[in-house]
């Protein structure tokens, strides 16, 4: 083995470890922080609205900065932006652990979200840079598997840590992991990737896009109130202005031809948006259904719900491997079809549905989502030139986050239509069950349409 081959092998291994740990860390933090929220509320005597901002501030920051940092990474170097992101994430985690008030906690969570955007926009792009077309699907599968493993372990391990070590421990654990990642990226990951280094950064476009996305996401969280619809309208208007701005400058933040002339890229991102819009609220709705309608304790409900991400983590690497051998659109489309079937089955659940059946439906969903996620990522990243890797990864991440918010928005609208502002009590269990069935029915139709978007993407080619 010559020196260059050995160095390339080390780079691939280092990049895969870096992306895998990053994926696990982000999902573990997200799922474990939800378990810790009641304890955080007690520490700072927060009301419900302020407490919700501990989670919301992070999500908004990620969504607002993903695309700008993706472009900055393409211009100044993906490794550089990733390294700064890991350092900032580690520091902001420490700040969250030593937060001294509710406001300081929210501010530090904003910083954590901004630094997470730097990591999200570059980790997959770095993987794409070091793995060839025939290898990256499997690499994506391993990284995506780590995401679902974090989602599975977060509530369990996060709950234990919060109970015995305090909620601060969830943030403190990022310190040694962050230091380890910094060592890997600075000492073992060789080279830099900045194929768009001669381009200028579009600050105006970044501002317009960030404000528009924030308005959209806050609007979705306030549905079905009038303010929610107004913010969504304002966000959509901002996106129209953003598109106009991008067509009238020399170095746009976003190459619109990626959407207009690259069907694979456009349809793969649309499929991702549809998939997350149709699936993200499932865990939220099923958690309420299991605890209220079925009467299960929180730990039993958690064990049932973990079936879905566990199956995802098991089959994602296999799905990525298949997407290297077969057309990614075929594997991803089969996955979305299986998700559609799983959603259709969940549409008919009620208080008499056996627990075993619910677990099987969730496992089917997990299997379908595993088949969809990493092949779809492979299709997106393999359809663009090297200079667009950062921005492509960021756009896909933005589709994921906005899809998640749309999913929760749909859920809030349906619950409001059936139950108004009534609390979930035995008297309204039938109404809640009806709202759940209606929502899952809508999600089934949406996901079925997504199958056609996935199939219609065509074969991968670079633009």
What spans do the regions from the language model cover?
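Small-residue-rich segments within alpha-helical transmembrane domains of MFS-like 12-TM solute carriers
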Residues: 27, 31, 97, 113-121, ...
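Structural signature of transmembrane alpha-helices in multi-pass secondary transporters
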Residues: 19, 23-27, 55-58, 62, ...
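Extracytoplasmic
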Residues: 14-51, 55, 64-66, 282-287
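Helix-loop-helix hairpins in multi-pass membrane proteins, especially solute transporters
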Residues: 70-204, 222, 386
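Hydrophobic transmembrane-helix bundles of small-molecule transporters
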Residues: 163-270, 304
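Small-residue hotspots at the loop-to-helix junctions and early N-terminal turns
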Residues: 45-52, 141, 298-303, 394
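12-transmembrane solute porter fold
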Residues: 14-21, 33-34, 146, 165, ...
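Central cavity-lining transmembrane alpha-helices of secondary-active solute carriers
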Residues: 56-70, 120-124, 306-319
